């Protein structure tokens, strides 16, 4: 019997996940991430995943605002799927491209005869 390969597509049973309570979703994510860590190739990365998972969930255990909790669950799900897809256990860097304000001059007023714009 071959081992089931964990991918971004089969890591989460979305039908089951959508029916869970908020607490159970958090537990489901916690267990899923630890299962992912057990299957990770590199020992050092495996330990990093376990440590970060435990510390992050421990840090957020006292949250009470449902919106923030849902955001944290979604963040955990997203990071797990990113790790599976890119095969990297660390958060993918986000690049912020600076937005420059371009000040455009208004078009010249056709009624203005001064010629100065």
Swiss-Prot record:
Pfam families: Complex1_LYR (PF05347)
Alphabetical list of InterPro entries matching this protein: Complex1_LYR_dom, Complex1_LYR_LYRM1, LYRM1
Disulfide bond annotation, renumbered to this chain: none
Lineage: superkingdom: Eukaryota
Protein family (similarity comment): Belongs to the complex I LYR family.
Record-given protein name: LYR motif-containing protein 1
Naturally occurring in which organism (per UniProt): Dictyostelium discoideum
């Amino acid at each position: 019997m071959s081992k089931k390969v964990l991918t971004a597509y089969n890591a989460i049973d979305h039908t089951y996940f959508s029916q869970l309570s908020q607490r159970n979703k958090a537990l489901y994510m916690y267990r899923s991430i630890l299962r992912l860590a057990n299957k990770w190739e590199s020992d050092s990365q495996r330990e990093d995943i376990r440590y970060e998972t435990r510390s992050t969930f421990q840090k957020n255990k006292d949250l009470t605002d449902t919106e923030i909790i849902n955001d944290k669950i979604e963040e955990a799900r997203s990071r797990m799927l990113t790790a599976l897809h890119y095969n990297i256990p660390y958060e993918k860097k986000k690049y912020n491209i600076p937005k420059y304000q371009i000040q455009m001059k208004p078009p010249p007023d056709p009624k203005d005869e001064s010629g100065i714009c």
